[in-house]
């Protein structure tokens, strides 16, 4: 199975996977408006790949088959201040004292 992978300039790390190159017919219009002008990144041969980085291969295949597209969202950014406070045994956010 082949799929086309597109990126957006609107949000780094967001990718749209399609079962056919340049066939956006199954992608909802509001999603296309939010995604913006898609830029082709690559064509993947899913049968020849065991892993796909951050994407679950079986979920990708299922979504392409059922919905006709798959939207990969960027990974959640870690809040370094909250992580540091937790490592010190503090709450994630400081108490507000005015």
Swiss-Prot record:
Residues 1-85 form the YcgL domain. Residues 77-98 are annotated as: Disordered. It comes from the Bacteria. PROSITE patterns: YCGL. InterPro entries: YcgL-like_sf (IPR038068), YcgL_dom (IPR027354). SUPFAM superfamilies: YcgL-like. It holds the Pfam family YcgL. This is YcgL domain-containing protein MADE_1012200.
